[in-house]
């Protein structure tokens, strides 16, 4: 691997979240939650954001915990790719 290729892969952001929708073809909606400290009161508040991520094989289902990685824009709303499954959804 060349030096330029190493720095390119390390610049991509990765996030971990839950799949909340798998209804689209080759796309999943991933909810990423993070805790942020309130600037004035100091209390930790839960913030969340939804990302559309590319799922080439339609293998990830609702409830799965996945890692997504930033990539090139694939559509108007989709520029993230699911890189791996962290934890499968529990079936009740």
Swiss-Prot record:
Checking Pfam families in the record gives: Ribosomal_S17
Q: Name one GO molecular function term.
A: rRNA binding
- Record's GO cellular component terms: cytosolic small ribosomal subunit
Which superkingdom is the protein from?
A: Bacteria
Keywords in alphabetical order, please.
Ribonucleoprotein, Ribosomal protein, RNA-binding, rRNA-binding
GO terms for biological process, alphabetical: translation
Q: Does the keyword Signal apply?
A: no
Q: Which family does it belong to?
A: Belongs to the universal ribosomal protein uS17 family.
- Function description: One of the primary rRNA binding proteins, it binds specifically to the 5'-end of 16S ribosomal RNA.
**Quaternary structure, from the entry:** Part of the 30S ribosomal subunit.
Query: Under which name does UniProt file this protein?
Result: Small ribosomal subunit protein uS17
The record lists the organism as Cupriavidus pinatubonensis (strain JMP 134 / LMG 1197)
Starting at the broadest rank, the lineage of the source organism is: Bacteria, Pseudomonadati, Pseudomonadota, Betaproteobacteria, Burkholderiales
């Amino acid at each position: 691997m060349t030096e330029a290729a190493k720095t390119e892969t390390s610049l991509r952001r990765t996030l971990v979240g839950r799949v909340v929708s798998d209804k689209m073809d080759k796309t999943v909606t991933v909810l990423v939650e993070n805790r942020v400290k309130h600037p004035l009161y100091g209390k930790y508040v839960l913030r969340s954001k939804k990302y559309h991520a590319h799922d080439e094989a339609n293998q990830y289902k609702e409830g799965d915990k996945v890692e997504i990685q930033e990539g090139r824009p694939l559509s108007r709303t989709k520029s993230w790719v699911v890189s791996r499954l962290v934890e499968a959804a529990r079936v009740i």
